[in-house]
Amino acid sequence: MVNQAFDFKQFRKLQRVGDVFLPNCNIDVIKTKLIEVEKLIQNNIDNYEFTSIKTTKKNDKLIYLLDKNADNFIYDEFILRKINHNIKRIYKVKQADRNIIVNQIYNILKENPNYYIYRLDINSFYEAINRNKIVNKIFSSSVISVETKKLLQKVFERIQETEGLPRGLSISATLSELYMKDFDYSIVTTDGVFYYSRFVDDIIIFSIKELTFDYLNKTLQENTSLKFNNKKTKIIKMESNKQETFEYLGYQYVINKNSTKLKKDNINVNIAPKKINKIKTKIILSLLDYNKNKNFELLKNRFLFLTCTYPIKTSHQKISSYKNSGYLQGGLFYNYHSLSKDNASLKKLDEFVRNILFSNNIYSQALRLSDKKELAKYSFAVAYNRKFTRNYNAKRFEINNITRCWKYA
């Protein structure tokens, strides 16, 4: 039985290690806020407003987020977490694990190559979802609590700029998974399909039988209000003695076939070109920002941040057990742990860094030769192979300051 109460005890269960990193927050402040928000919900739920929700734009899409400096931020954040928790637990919604998917695809590619691969992308995923279908499902449920329904309705009242789901808010990922269940089931049970994965709007299908795009499109439209992005659709017929390339979840798979059974060395897994370009953009932005502020220590920290893997801890916690303690984790090896041993994409990044540092250009002209040599020591390939980890304590190390100039990268 799921306890759906919006009270202090349930809120505390949803606390994360990173919460103490939030502006003007510590354990005592969060505790006080959670006691306050429990009283607000109990005494006046009908008049509650999500006042910290704001919007920004990225790649011409409207992004919803919570203003961390708003007075009601902690209230809104934990209420949204609890709404999300209740719906996930009751409907058994679980988002796919990217790392598991990547490993599964690699293992499939090593097997007999006689099959079809379908790479599909859904156009304007969150914005095009029929919100009313989800609302009707949840609001007609006798299992979802009245408080959860009321507070979810309050969220939708706050985001009237979009008819779909609010891109950026945590509940949208859960609601979209609930919305896509029928489509997922239809594809999984299609004759010939032996592997299907969808990570948000990115889809990959392996089938021993040919599936027409018309069939896939019809199945999507019968179960949802969505459409495929035709420009990103790729259908591959795997055949012997033929090289194929496709991208999925930030990786690029290059398959070189020379027999009916692929060898491990015939499959190269690299960072996808778009992701490589994104890293290159961050390097350039870091150098341009240095040209303005002349803060070499900050520039070094940015190069370090890009090349290393990092668990993030608070000042009162031990780092040694972060994997089992809900610690935040990020960085190069964590994001791309399934690359091929030759690290071709990482070597290209190292080459890019050397070229931009030691050639005549506007990006590195303000650096001294000794500084350039020091920056060149930060190697993507070496850090990846050694699984180099840097421990960050957010109270003494300004991660936000490091990433500030990459905001629109």
Model-flagged regions — what are they?
Residues 52-55, 92-98:
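Short N-terminal amphipathic alpha-helices
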Residues 49-59, 147-159, 323-326:
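Active-site-adjacent bridging/hinge elements
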Residues 99, 109-200, 204-219, 224-231, ...:
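Conserved polymerase palm-domain catalytic core
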Residues 31-55, 138-148:
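An acidic intrinsically disordered interaction segment
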Residues 64-68, 119-120, 161-169, 200, ...:
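Glycine- and acidic
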Residues 1-46, 73-81, 85-96, 103-108, ...:
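Right-hand nucleic-acid polymerase module
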Residues 58-92, 161-188:
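Conserved pre-motif C helix in the palm subdomain of viral-like polymerases
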